[in-house]
Regions:
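A hydrophobic alpha-helical transmembrane-helix feature that marks the membrane cores
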Residues: 1-246
């Protein structure tokens, strides 16, 4: 999910020395515009997920079906993986519109999978966790955007840490260790806080060299990566701040 497809390098603009425009200023302006599209698309994806999730949670028939058919949940999980793989691997070979539709389809499927959280946790604690997540995500994304430090080494470390987190999570499905679960939750928060900054910096760097015909594609893959950072950070924070209805 973090193997981003890098768009073809920007082939440079034909700036005349006598032109009134400043190349550096133009690049900064274009990068800012692309990042706005990334954040907008990510936000729309989150809204799709929230709407679908609340709608499904409000359907007793859907929740009953999901509770009695575990294969359905795993089917949603597999569908999410397939959609992410298709978007990442085929990004440059599909139209910008197709990539956007697949992204929103992924957001919708994820909303269906996340519906149970509205049954397990109170609405107040979900809202509180969301605002904590939004504030944390926003702060780290701003840091990743404006920092002059190269986050590549940190990002690479976090990527491998993420793999370790996934393995530990699978192991804990069988061991059901409370202590390991707590460690996993803490590590998950730290990893996705860091990945938010790293992904933001990567997207900004890619935006500086993206040709006009690939801007829409970059907005989609950038939105997907930040969307995943936000959702995962939210879910790990929910383990700490979520209040059970029981």
């Amino acid at each position: 999910m973090y193997n981003q497809t890098t768009p073809p390098p920007y082939n440079g603009g034909n700036y005349n020395n006598n032109s009134w425009s400043n190349p550096t200023s133009n690049i900064v302006s274009a990068t800012s515009a692309i990042m706005k599209r990334v954040y907008l698309k990510m936000t729309l994806g989150l809204l799709v997920t929230a709407f679908i999730s609340m709608f499904c949670a409000g359907s007793s028939a859907y929740m009953q079906f999901m509770a009695t058919n575990s294969w359905f949940y795993w089917g949603l999980f597999i569908a999410e993986i397939v959609l992410v793989m298709v978007i990442s691997a085929r990004l440059t070979k599909m139209s910008s519109m197709a990539a956007s539709l697949l992204f929103y389809a992924f957001a919708a499927v994820n909303g269906m999978a996340l519906a149970p959280i509205f049954i397990v946790y109170t609405a107040t604690s979900i809202a509180k966790t969301f605002f904590i997540c939004a504030g944390t995500f926003g702060a780290m994304s701003v840091y990743g955007y404006f920092t002059t430090n190269d986050l590549t080494k940190v990002g690479n470390f976090l990527f491998y840490a993420l793999i370790g987190l996934i393995i530990a999570s699978v192991v804990n499905i069988f061991t059901k260790s409370t202590a390991l679960g707590w460690v996993i939750s803490c590590a998950g928060v730290l990893i996705f806080v860091g990945l938010t900054a790293w992904d933001t910096q990567k997207i900004k760097q890619m935006a500086q060299y993206t040709p006009a015909n690939m801007v829409g594609h970059l907005a989609t893959i950038g939105a997907l990566n930040l969307y995943l950072d936000f959702i995962n950070l939210f879910l790990y924070l929910l383990r700490f701040f979520g209040n059970s209805r029981d």
